[in-house]
UniProtKB/Swiss-Prot annotation:
This is DNA-directed RNA polymerase 132 kDa polypeptide. It catalyses: RNA(n) + a ribonucleoside 5'-triphosphate = RNA(n+1) + diphosphate. Its main location: virion. The lineage of its organism: Viruses, Varidnaviria, Bamfordvirae, Nucleocytoviricota, Pokkesviricetes. Its EC number is 2.7.7.6. One of its GO terms (cellular component) is DNA-directed RNA polymerase complex. Transmembrane segments: none annotated. The gene is RPO132. Part of the DNA-dependent RNA polymerase which catalyzes the transcription of viral DNA into RNA using the four ribonucleoside triphosphates as substrates. Responsible for the transcription of early, intermediate and late genes. DNA-dependent RNA polymerase associates with the early transcription factor (ETF), itself composed of D6 and A7, thereby allowing the early genes transcription. Late transcription, and probably also intermediate transcription, require newly synthesized RNA polymerase. It comes from the Viruses. Gene3D superfamilies: 2.40.50.150, 3.90.1100.10, DNA-directed RNA polymerase, subunit 2, domain 6, RNA polymerase alpha subunit dimerisation domain. GO terms for biological process: DNA-templated transcription. It is found in: Virion. Pfam families: RNA_pol_Rpb2_3, RNA_pol_Rpb2_5, RNA_pol_Rpb2_6, RNA_pol_Rpb2_7, rpo132. Belongs to the RNA polymerase beta chain family.
Length: 1161
């Protein structure tokens, strides 16, 4: 039942407008930004400048905001394959308000009605075949024939969900022994715009406890934290001491007493007044910053904006919030490991599509307003009038910022991050679900240390889909299939917070005012109450109960009871939280089991939202923080094995293992039956598999798109099915035999049947973009030149449609002309071809030509080519059994079974044992069983569910296959049945027609073709360009590059004894040959000056030198020079050896032996 409930979550839920679960939270986030948040951001009414003691003000107001999105939602747009973008217009009014005796006089300085539909253009979620979603490209030939696809630079191509830098928990850091810091961020709520950010730091040095300060750069005073708390809460030191010591470990109480005592040096000074003391610090900070505002405004900004996330709270509540932070700080010093560290996902929120654009829109709006303010200021300073340039008004930077985002750059200050390349359909789902980190958060040093699977990532992140190499090796980033990211609109946020506070205030006032010895309650870190310790468990249980029955009209609230001496109840309702469902355990009993029979009857007819509504206590949505601070059993089977007493310790139970995998890992089969590395390698190879795109390939001008004939996998998981990966396909079923074949399939080599290839097996179509930029004067040049490269061009200078391009053919005309400075030449103008050529090794047909005319002519050509498997192409199974075609055999060369069937592919059987991929055998057994019984007892086609990770025993699958054969072929005897179940066949040798002595494992398998194609990588050249430094062939086939001759290549030739070949490759060419003179005294290379060769070292010492001329490679000289530059001296020594000569070989009589025994005479 737990598996069925997990599957229900993955399925579409139309009642909640969930049509595609993998990307649903992304669509909701994007729609919230366009439909709601953008208007909130743009609704500005702000004073820019004020004069004459605020009697004259310059006020900016943005109104008449019109957002024109499509009539349908982004979710429906994605399903129907329609484009989704939005146009935004607004009006900017700049007015001058003057307070006179007669009242307020308002005059308009400037007003701009933004009727231009391009003022803000929200990029496409899904778009047509334009390269840039912000500009309309023009198709020259031919016109668009229709068809929609996910655009190259549309929103769904934004690669990863970035982790926010700011943390929701304070960060504890050990600066040095006995010195610590506790830094935290305070961000204003979503309804406060513009957003205010404040970052504070509490420092503590155990040797100088009187300097336990809280500070913030230029936004707050530096003050003793105890003094500030006393100032805010207006209580004595005993009250503060009782709060800090209540329920704390004994070892921390000594430190608390010392901190309180050290603060008395300030508080018990003569004639001390705490209000005057704080006021003096404010004045001192005012003088230090040299603020241009008045002292009253400075004081108000400093104190009112202290802790912006509690902007509407009283000073007392802010003080108690600081007191709670100080309590955590002290506890951290002694129990660091029990506090969420900075790598914990408990501390972080995740940016989704909508949040990307929300942050960018906020930043660009502030830049826009700042530019207007600066223009008015300069105009007033220089001309004495308040005017603003129309150019400043009409050029907001939204479109430029959005375009930068789609190019992989989030902000100007942030480094670029990887946008995903759309190699396969799976990456539409997998990459936008992954969570990435800023470049400075992933240190290169982590390459050399083992990355641990952080406890906070358990169940929410996929442990299998991790990079296997590079600086991000082992970085857990893919969300599990059940995980999503929370979204909430501003109005919903305010209503939900008010509803929660209303519920909290239903408790007796005395029970929620235990600020001295109670547990504080925070909503998004905003302290709202402190509850009686005796009521904590009752409050949390009742809150969870009300949450599940949708009392607050939101099922994604997170509530965490943080015990362990920190005494806090944290309620989280904001966006960016990782959430997923869990099974509820109540008083030691799994609620699912109490209504199991009723659920079993209805499970096929209800949706996930129906379960939440009609059976609210079966499943609860937990955010990651609530999960960490709850007791969760890892599976239902483990929970049922526990004793009754142990069961009562748990709050929740997790779903089966398959739901902890990501969508890429879910395409694999039985990874828990294989060795660990196979899961990691399998995920990497699944991303490289060639799939069938769901969009019109002919209109998609993009790099390296391949199309495979669609064939749905028979053995799959529910996540693969509901995510549409199975329908879009990423492989084909082939008949595989596990055996050795004449030594051809050693190691990774595989043998493929020629007739299988000729019939279209694993055949693909490659659609490739070829793009060139040509100066417009070269493109329009009418000069004629004789070049065979232009044979495929049309009269307009572009390559013809349906032309077959060969290596060396030009894609577009590019003729450069020059004038010779020679008066004796009649025709002193020469023209020559500088066009870029088609460089692929294979011919391909021109499918589309697109031209964009700007300052240059940008030509994009889409070519199509059918590509059959050839020697060197790579393939893999879903268990990471990667292989390379080593031999293509005809059918007559291959072994056959009793029915004359020959295998399509032969794989080395030892690979199963060496790589420990037992699940590959199970997949073949199940696929073979499906082939004999593809329909269930109701006559419906039923794919076989074999999840990526499962707790099912292998014998269960064997028994399932056995029943399939017994049902389909009931007259099989026991031995024949076992042979069929285990796919064991007697094969016959094609040369002798005799059976092999051993049965061969042969059966159907879903096989994947990878993007690593021989013709894309093979490089052939005799001579060409070389790099200046090492004088080896440069890289890149487009640049006429070749393969570098390195150490391994050299060692191969040495092993073959090909000394002359090595000499020819490394030394004999003019560029590589290098004569050097070496001093036999010191081993230095001699210096050549004015045609004289001498050793610098020995000459300075007046020593006689003997220079010996040697010939070596240029690379050797470069190596010696680099070593010398690093202070490492290398001596070249000479050993005298006598010359070696090969002795004469023995003469061998090669005449036939029959002639030796007969006299020919």
């Amino acid at each position: 039942m737990d598996q069925k409930l997990g599957n229900k979550f993955l399925e579409p839920d139309p009642k909640q407008n969930v049509f595609y679960r993998p990307l649903h939270f992304q669509y909701v986030s994007y729609e919230n930004f366009i439909s709601y948040r953008l208007k909130e951001i743009l609704s500005v009414n702000r004073t820019l400048l004020s004069f004459k003691n605020d009697t004259e003000k310059i006020v900016l107001r943005i109104n008449n905001i019109k957002i024109i999105p499509p009539d349908y939602s982004p979710i429906i747009a994605s399903i129907k394959g329609k484009s989704y973008d939005a146009l935004v217009t607004f009006t900017v009014d700049i007015r001058k308000e003057v307070m006179t005796k007669d009242g307020l006089h308002v005059s308009t300085i400037s007003s701009y009605e933004g009727n231009d539909s391009q003022l803000i253009k929200i990029p496409l979620l899904i778009g047509y075949g334009n390269k840039n979603p912000l500009d309309n490209s023009k198709f020259v030939s031919p016109n668009i024939i229709g068809g929609v696809f996910i655009n190259k630079q549309s929103i769904e191509k934004v690669g990863i969900n970035i982790v926010e830098k700011t943390t929701t928990w304070p960060k504890f850091k050990i600066v040095k022994p006995n010195a610590y810091t506790f830094s935290f961020s305070s961000i204003s709520p979503v309804n406060i715009l513009p957003t205010k950010y404040r970052h504070y730091k509490i420092t503590m040095d155990l040797s100088q406890l009187e300097n336990c300060y809280i500070s913030s750069a230029k936004t707050f005073i530096t003050v003793n934290v105890i003094v500030l708390i006393k100032f805010l809460i207006n209580q004595d030191l005993n009250y503060i001491k009782n709060n800090l010591t209540y329920g704390m470990p004994l070892e921390t109480i000594y430190l608390i007493n010392a901190i309180i005592e050290s603060s008395k040096t300030i508080l018990e000074a003569e004639d001390f007044n705490i209000n005057d003391y704080i006021e003096s610090l404010i004045e001192s900070e005012f003088q230090k910053q040299r603020s241009i505002t008045s002292i009253d405004d400075f004081r108000y900004d400093l104190m009112y904006n202290f802790l912006p996330h509690m902007v509407n709270s009283s000073d007392q509540l802010k003080g108690f919030y600081l007191l709670g932070l100080l309590r955590k700080f002290i506890y951290c010093i002694y129990h660091t490991s029990r506090y969420p560290d900075r790598d914990s996902m408990v501390c972080h929120r995740v940016l989704t599509y909508g949040r990307y654009f929300e942050i960018l829109a906020n930043d660009e709006l502030e830049n826009y307003i700042t530019n207007i303010k600066n223009d008015i200021t300069n105009s007033h300073k220089n001309k004495g009038v308040c005017n603003v340039s129309i150019h400043v008004l009409t050029t907001p930077g939204f479109n430029h910022a959005f375009s930068g985002l789609l190019s992989g750059k989030f902000k100007k200050t942030d480094g670029s991050y990887r946008t995903h390349p759309h190699y396969s359909w799976m990456q539409n789902i997998s990459i936008p679900r992954s969570v990435g980190y800023y470049p400075d958060q992933v240190k290169i040093s982590k390459m050399f240390s083992v990355r641990k699977y952080h406890p906070s990532q358990y169940a929410f992140f996929c442990p299998s889909d991790v990079p296997e190499r590079g600086p991000q090796v082992g970085l857990i980033s893919q969300l599990s299939v059940l995980t999503s990211v929370s979204n909430i609109r501003t109005t919903e946020y305010i209503d939900l917070k008010n509803a929660i506070m209303k519920y909290i205030y239903t408790y007796d006032k005395n029970d929620i005012s235990y600020f001295q010895t109670g547990h504080i309650i925070t909503i998004e870190n905003d302290l709202v109450a402190a509850i009686n310790p005796e009521l904590v468990d009752k409050f949390v249980d009742d809150f969870k109960f009300r949450k599940r029955v949708n009392y607050f009209d939101n099922l994604e609230i997170g509530i965490s009871n943080v015990k362990d001496h920190m005494n806090e109840i944290r309620i989280n309702i904001g966006s960016g939280r990782l959430i997923r469902p869990f099974l509820v355990v109540y008083k030691g009993e799994l609620v699912m089991d109490t209504i199991g029979e009723e659920l079993e009857k209805r499970i096929d007819t209800i949706t996930f939202s129906d379960i939440q509504k009609e059976y609210p206590h079966v499943i609860e949505m937990l955010d990651l923080e609530q999960f960490v601070f709850s007791n969760v059993c890892e599976s239902v089977s483990k929970f049922r094995e526990l004793s009754d007493e142990d069961k009562k310790l748990y709050d929740y139970c997790d779903f089966p293992n398959e739901f902890r995998d990501g969508y890429v890992a879910s395409t694999l089969v039985g990874i828990n039956h294989n060795s660990g590395p196979r899961a990691i390698l399998g995920c990497a190879q699944a991303k490289q598999a060639i799939s069938c795109l769901s969009s019109d390939l002919r209109n998609k001008i993009d790099n390296g798109i391949h199309l495979l004939y669609p064939e749905r996998p028979i053995v799959l998981s529910k996540a693969t099915e509901t995510s549409k990966i199975a329908i879009n396909c990423f492989g084909q079923h082939v008949l595989v035999a596990l055996m050795s074949y004449k030594g051809m399939n050693q190691e990774d080599g595989i043998v493929v049947k020629r007739e299988f290839i000729e019939r279209g097996g694993l055949d693909i179509v490659t659609a490739k973009k070829h793009q060139v930029e040509i100066p417009i004067e070269n493109f329009k040049n009418r000069e004629r030149i004789n070049s065979t490269a232009y044979s495929k061009l049309d009269i307009n200078g572009l390559v013809r449609l349906n032309a077959f391009l060969e290596p060396g053919d030009a894609i577009a005309k590019n003729i450069s002309s020059r004038t010779l400075d020679d008066d004796f030449v009649a025709d002193n103008q020469i023209s020559f071809d500088i066009s870029e050529k088609y460089t692929d090794m294979y011919m391909s047909r021109v499918e589309r030509v697109q031209v964009d005319l700007t300052d240059k002519v940008k030509v994009r050509v889409l070519t199509m080519k059918e590509r059959r498997p050839i020697m060197g192409d790579k393939f893999t199974s879903r268990t990471s059994q990667k292989g390379t075609i080593a031999y293509i055999a005809s059918e007559s060369e291959l072994p056959y079974d009793k029915n004359g069937v020959t295998p399509d592919i032969i794989i080395n059987s030892t690979s199963i044992y060496s790589r420990k991929t037992i699940s590959m055998l199970i997949e073949m057994i199940l696929t073979s069983a499906y082939s004999v019984k593809p329909y269930n007892n109701n006559g419906k086609n039923r794919p076989i569910c074999f999840p990526s990770s499962n707790e099912t025993d292998i014998e269960y699958y064997i028994e399932f296959a056995r029943k399939c054969y017994q049902s389909a072929i009931p007259d099989l005897d026991k031995d024949e049945l076992e042979n069929e179940v285990y796919c064991e066949s007697i094969l016959y040798d094609p040369e002798t027609d005799k059976p092999y002595k051993t049965k061969v494992f042969m059966g159907p398998l879903y096989y994947l073709r990878l993007r690593h194609l021989t013709q894309d990588k093979a490089t052939v050249r005799c001579r060409g360009k070389k790099t200046k430094l090492i004088r080896q062939a440069n890289e890149g086939r487009k640049r006429g590059g070749g393969i570098k001759f390195g150490e391994m290549e050299r060692d191969c030739l040495i092993a073959h004894g090909a000394a002359n070949t090595i000499t020819e490759i490394l030394k004999d060419s003019e560029e590589d040959y290098q004569d050097v003179y070496v001093c036999e005294n010191c081993g230095d290379i001699a210096t050549k000056k004015n045609n004289n060769v001498y050793c610098i070292r020995c000459t300075k010492l007046n020593l006689y030198t003997v220079l010996t001329k040697i010939d070596t490679t240029h690379v050797s000289k470069v190596f010696l020079t680099q070593m010398n530059a690093r202070g490492i001296k290398i001596n070249l020594t000479f050993n005298e050896q006598n010359p070696l000569f090969y002795k004469p070989m023995k003469q061998i009589d090669l005449s036939p032996t029959i002639l030796k025994n007969h006299d020919l005479s």
